[in-house]
Amino acid sequence: MNLDYFKILFFKLTLERFPNIFRPTSSPYISGDGFRKISDHIFDESCTLDPNKINFNDIVFLNPELADIYFSNFHNQVSNKYYLVTHNSNIEIGKYIEKYIDEKIIHWFALNLDLNHPKATLIPYGLENLRRLRYGRKEWFKSKKFLKSENYVLASFDIFKNYDEREPILEILKNNKLVKFNKFSSKREYFYNLKSFKFLICPIGQGYDTSRIWEGLLCGVYPILKLNEHSKILKEIGLPAIYLEDWNDLNNYDKQAFNDFYTKFKNTKEFNINSFTHWKEKFKLLKSNY
């Protein structure tokens, strides 16, 4: 093994041990650490906050793994109304919104949103945080030249991230000639090949949302999603994707159907929910107009 390997290994181990050392955004792309960066206060595995310093209209970033601690010990000490952002966790957030939202929270922006609430808005997973130095590296998305071949649907996922949900997909679609089940030896190989497909199967993993959805869109590849409480919201807000009641339904689509979907999605106006600039401007507007 060469010296560079050990340098990278040391760097990764250091980042895991000291999570506040390296927290870059993925701008111009979305990531959890991007939302974290544009917040006024942070309460997560590496930062705490002073509730007395939360001013009217401020944005608080919360890792929902710590939601019970935050709401039991900090939120009740806040005297001003504020915006809440929850990200960087696989937790289904609906139960916490129902339990904790009150008049002090002007609006709650949430990853893995799984209910409709007038004071809650879905925010995307986006890319894996850049600090992981894996799938979220910006170099994978710089090229906008997508050379589409006769590859229609890619299925490339780790079934052990959610075995009960993902393993049946292999059996259901194993004879579908338009679906390619591929494993890749590196991230570079994955993204190079991904760009040649039109659609990407995106089953839920450890949480409802997954970086796979947003990586695919940045590569000109549209997600195929099974309907659930989270993906129903994505459908409502107009995310270009094929939505299925059951994975078996995918076996009813032929090449013409996929081509029709692909043409329709390509001709749809740009979907700004996948733009970090959109969210920065939205938050800036909220803070100035409330």
Predicted regions and their residues:
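Short alpha-helix at the nucleotide-sugar/activated-sugar donor binding site of glycosyltransferases
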Residues: 217
